A protein has these predicted regions:
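N-terminal low-complexity or amphipathic/hydrophobic leaders
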Residues: 5-78
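Acidic/histidine-enriched, glycine/proline-rich intrinsically disordered or flexible terminal extensions
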Residues: 8, 220-246
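Buried hydrophobic positions in well-ordered alpha/beta secondary-structure cores of metabolic enzymes
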Residues: 28, 118, 179-181
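General beta-strand structural signal in soluble alpha/beta enzymes
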Residues: 36-39, 98-100, 126-130, 147, ...
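Short, charged beta->alpha transition segments
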Residues: 43, 77-90
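Extracellular/luminal Protease-associated
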Residues: 86-129
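A contiguous pocket-lining binding segment that forms or flanks enzyme active sites
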Residues: 128-129, 135-183
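A hydrophobic, small-residue-rich beta->alpha segment in the mid-to-C-terminal subdomain
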Residues: 180-221
């Protein structure tokens, strides 16, 4: 387990609720972070924004000896203490369980009973590039769920949980424990925790500039092309827009 990582404050998480994933992606690209968008991971409950800190869980292909390794007590007697339970117990308000299932969207990482623990821990949500069993039931808990799919199958014949709060991949991108996980209608973006505060103001300004462009071009009936890339005219209409907000 990683001993220490940057824990982004709840106040910063709250701020990102109103920032678009596309804007965050653009700001990260400027800094050389190109692989931060998860492939094949989509919301099972469209319309639910997700912002939270990653608690990571890694799955491996199943094998009998791995089953023996990860099951530490009382299997089948209510005391199955695998790493999946460790990950769920590690959650706190503002955290997101992020499970690396090697892109196996048809393989379950858990179902409605297991993932009820996310609700009782008051965590922010669930992200996995694997599948979610009983997905239609899990989304009734009300938290955001982003996954590679919904499936009726159980996972154990194919995968087993292996380790918690270590760097993982999910949807083909790196997720470090504590990274900020952002989910919207476009999918899931991973914001490195050390950059969360640094890029926030630039993200807000970018969204404001684009809103100013949209309002101006709609009002005047002109093409947005005159304001991209951002230029002196862009700055002019942005300042006018900003003044109207104050």
């Amino acid at each position: 387990m990683v001993d220490a990582f940057v824990r982004v404050p709840d106040t910063i998480l709250k701020n990102y609720q109103s920032v678009s994933n596309a804007t965050v992606l653009g700001q990260l690209a400027k800094r050389g972070y190109m692989k931060v968008f998860m492939n094949g991971v989509r919301s099972l409950a469209p319309g639910r924004r997700l912002v939270g800190r990653a608690v990571t869980l890694r799955y491996l292909p199943s094998r009998p000896d791995l089953q023996e390794h990860v099951t530490r007590g009382g299997y089948g007697e209510g005391l199955n203490e695998t790493p999946r339970w460790d990950a769920l117990e590690a959650l706190s308000p503002g955290d997101v369980l992020v499970a690396d299932c090697m892109g196996m969207g048809g393989t379950s990482t858990g179902g409605d009973v297991v993932f009820s623990r996310i609700l009782s821990k008051q965590a922010a949500g669930l992200v996995t590039d694997g599948g979610v069993r009983d997905g239609h039931k899990v989304i009734r808990y009300g938290y955001p769920v982003y996954a590679g799919g919904s499936t009726p199958t159980i996972g154990e014949p194919n995968v087993l949980p292996y380790e918690v709060n270590e760097p993982i991949q999910c949807g083909g991108v790196l997720v470090w424990p504590g990274d900020v996980i952002l989910g919207d209608e476009d999918g899931v973006v991973v914001l490195p925790s050390k950059l969360a505060l640094e890029i926030y103001d630039e993200c807000v300004r970018h969204d404001e500039v684009e809103q100013a462009i949209l309002e101006h071009t709609q009002k005047e009936g002109i093409s947005p092309k005159f304001f991209y890339p951002f230029n002196s005219e862009t700055e002019k209409i942005y300042k006018a827009w900003k003044a109207r907000q104050d």
